[in-house]
């Protein structure tokens, strides 16, 4: 007799929906897994799948601070942060991060996803025109939808198209990433600010992939460009360079007084716990003094970008994120397998993170990579580029 629990049949429309996903996303692949699921890296492989750009996830100072805080904090408040907005309850880390980035206030959130949705839901009245770079993170698109605003995409980093969109639809909100998470390009923030000023638009910059890596002491690209007084709002994920979890929304003090009581992600999520905040505080301390790691990160990234371009790849990256543009899903699967057989592991980006037949394999460089690692990656990529059955944009 089987011990397998009996389940009632699903409604046919649900069954059909799930069957469609299984066939469309899984069963058509050679390994009968989703395209993002290749081999498991073995010892000695070069793995470029993590956003831990400064290699802090194994930092002993940070781990010890977190461990001590877990033992010390026995007064955890497992509730929504909406109840913790008085001055005595707000974590000092919010003030520290605001001063670090150069903004008036900071609010922690559960994730970068929650930060972007909560911010746009708060600042956008229904039907507000929101001008969004085509490559901006999906959480910004979802924030527009949650706000009931109107998305007006503009071509990637194309200021002429942005101008035409604003002239056609009027004053609104411009949202961009500082460093784009798919192909590693950098937003022309000065030009975007000038456009926002000319047309009286609010400006939101997601610094998830530049906070900690760019700017003085890692304080971000906005601060590096001396635009903190011109950019209205900054959002970040603290699951990248901060190598943990949570997000943050930075802006004027008026935002901090209102968003916790308006934004659904803030109201209907539990607060970040005290021991987690201790870890984030220690991480910020380490990041501030990590100029050597930032120098090494950009050195390795430049080595990889230069080497790939010399091979013949079309590389658009200007940062520590480097993408091989592989096109179709079948070709991407073949490229992934080819590289992984040679102990080179990137992260596959496919729909819905990219457009159909616009798949990429993303290499996220980290500060602990060596010149030997880069040489190994370039050797494998040279072989892939010359392979008659593999295609690249």
Curated annotation (Swiss-Prot):
GO molecular function annotation: 8-amino-7-oxononanoate synthase activity; pyridoxal phosphate binding; transaminase activity
Gene3D superfamilies: Aspartate Aminotransferase, domain 1, Type I PLP-dependent aspartate aminotransferase-like (Major domain)
Entry's EC annotation: 2.3.-.-
Keywords recorded for this protein, A-Z: Acyltransferase, Aminotransferase, Pyridoxal phosphate, Transferase
Sequence intervals crossing the membrane: none
Any one GO BP annotation for this protein: biotin biosynthetic process
Record PTM N6-(pyridoxal phosphate)lysine, positions in chain: 240
Cofactors, names only: pyridoxal 5'-phosphate
InterPro entries xrefs: Aminotransferase_I/II_large, AON_synthase_class-II, PyrdxlP-dep_Trfase, PyrdxlP-dep_Trfase_major, PyrdxlP-dep_Trfase_small
Family to which the UniProt record says this protein belongs: Belongs to the class-II pyridoxal-phosphate-dependent aminotransferase family.
Function as written in the Swiss-Prot or TrEMBL entry: Required for the synthesis of the quorum-sensing autoinducer CAI-1 ((S)-3-hydroxytridecan-4-one) which probably functions as an intragenus signal.
Name recorded for this polypeptide: CAI-1 autoinducer synthase
Organism: Vibrio campbellii (strain ATCC BAA-1116)
Gene of this entry: cqsA
């Amino acid at each position: 007799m089987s011990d397998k629990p009996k389940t009632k049949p699903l409604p046919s429309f649900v069954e059909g929906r799930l069957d469609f996903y299984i066939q469309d996303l899984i069963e058509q692949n050679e390994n009968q897994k989703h395209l993002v699921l290749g081999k498991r890296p073995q010892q000695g492989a070069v793995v470029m799948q993590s956003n831990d750009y400064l290699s802090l996830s194994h930092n002993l100072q940070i781990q010890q601070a977190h461990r001590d805080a877990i033992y010390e904090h026995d007064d955890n408040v497992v509730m929504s942060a909406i109840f913790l907005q008085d001055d005595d309850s707000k974590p000092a880390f919010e003030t520290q991060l605001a001063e670090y980035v150069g903004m008036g206030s900071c609010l922690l959130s559960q994730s970068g996803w929650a930060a972007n949705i909560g911010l746009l839901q708060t600042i956008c009245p229904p039907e507000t025109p929101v001008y969004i770079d085509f490559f901006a993170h999906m959480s910004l698109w979802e924030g527009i939808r949650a706000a009931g605003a109107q998305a007006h995409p503009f071509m990637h980093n194309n200021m002429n198209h942005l101008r035409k969109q604003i002239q056609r639809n009027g004053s609104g909100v411009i949202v961009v990433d500082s460093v784009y998470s798919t192909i590693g390009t950098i937003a022309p923030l000065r030009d975007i600010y000038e456009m926002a000023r000319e047309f009286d638009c609010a400006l939101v910059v997601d610094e998830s992939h530049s906070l900690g890596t760019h700017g003085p002491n890692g304080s971000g690209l906005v601060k590096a460009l001396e635009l903190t007084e011109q950019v209205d709002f900054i959002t970040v994920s603290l699951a990248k360079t901060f190598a943990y979890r949570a997000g943050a929304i930075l802006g004027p003090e008026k935002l901090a007084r209102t968003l916790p009581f308006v934004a659904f992600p803030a109201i209907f999520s539990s607060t970040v716990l005290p021991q987690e905040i201790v870890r984030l505080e220690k991480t910020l301390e380490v990041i501030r003094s990590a100029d050597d790691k930032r120098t090494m990160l950009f050195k390795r990234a430049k080595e990889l970008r230069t080497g790939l371009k010399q091979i013949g790849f079309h590389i658009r990256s200007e940062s520590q994120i480097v993408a091989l543009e592989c096109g179709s899903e079948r070709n991407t699967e073949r490229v992934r397998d080819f590289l992984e057989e040679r102990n080179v592991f990137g992260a596959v980006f496919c729909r819905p993170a990219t457009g159909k037949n616009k798949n990429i394999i993303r290499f996220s460089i980290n500060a602990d990579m060596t010149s030997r690692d880069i040489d190994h990656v370039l050797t494998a990529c040279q072989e892939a580029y010359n392979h008659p059955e593999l295609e690249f944009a």
